[in-house]
């Protein structure tokens, strides 16, 4: 990651794109307080990523491609576990658990082991758990990998609902059609941000019809490095 600079607004859906090895995962780990940058300045949810990494962790949500769920725990047990980690109180957890299961249509699956859920259901549950504590920002690392297009669209509806509640969404994806769903996107090449704007403006700037065409133009000049 080489001297990247950007700002993300509250409630914005910000796409963080780049090929494997571009530096996306490394940058995200720095923003989440999991890796320490060697230089520069940065704030996440209002907290300094150098001096207040633990505060950063408490005020964010995170979901990886593997969904961050415990397969051998029941649906409600996963919710309770992660809510407890984020310091939520027992009564609040119980109330919000019932609301969440009803909203997702999971009420009948409350006692089902997560490993028995269809992949798309696991995905929706993992995202809902990652924002259960109403974080200021949620980081989604390749969240829709391995699921069908219809399920991906349903997942993005959940993302829009979260953004409407004021939760900032920071998402990495390999699917260029998903880039169109973001308010703004950045594209990393060899550790640097080579483009940052709305999808419409980037397509206009590069004189192309799709975000995939934008990405291909930038990626042609990449020198691949380990992420």
What spans do the regions from the language model cover?
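Conserved ABC transporter NBD signature motif
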Residues: 40-51, 55-56
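Conserved catalytic motifs of ABC-family nucleotide-binding domains
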Residues: 134
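Catalytic Walker B motif of ABC-type/P-loop ATPase nucleotide-binding domains
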Residues: 138-142
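ABC ATPase "signature
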Residues: 196-197
